[in-house]
């Protein structure tokens, strides 16, 4: 329910789990070995068509790849207008082979993106619904340098320890990409000379935030592979979009977190410097996503 009352809660959409027909065997941001993050820019005036295409593609992928991959869809609400995000959660890189095989050989899948979806608008499919050349993919794996599970204790077939091993018990259920009401993807580029310290700082920051806001914010750490070296990602799973304000309050008003952030980490130009000295300036971005809602009745 939408409200124009000042201070009223942001109207919430169902969590991404509502996009799925079944929850058994679900792979999420806390259980995946890697996440393929695909982004596409919707052409202006084609938002409803983009949502319909995304739902149909997602439904088919989850049906055909149910044991190997779970795809969840989100819309960017703070950042770039009109961008769709797909998070394809997999256990290992080899599972990507099934996806490629489906794209190349599955006739029903090909019909979804080749058939005429715009008969009343001059014809066409995704190539008109989305801006050409706007699709990009990043591959993220859970940050495993500080995970509580050692690499030699991995389950058979696992790539790295899933992100759930980063998290200490809080007395509240952890949020993940299927249960969160909103998802913030925070991305930052570590300086090469302080790359290990940057990872450790984010681990300390993550641990503090999870303890300070249990059941409200769950932070999980990832890093990019097959892309930019030392580009780090924090997946901030929020109970609702309103809790983005709670995150801001923690970073600006919580004395314990402020002390952690101000703690000298590295020396720059002979001066002890806090967390900012670990990262390339002006590279930290927050992309705020909401789960794609069900179609309107």
Stretch-by-stretch model annotation:
Residues 2-262, 266-297:
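Short S/T/G/P-rich N-terminal loop/turn motif that feeds into the first structured element of a domain
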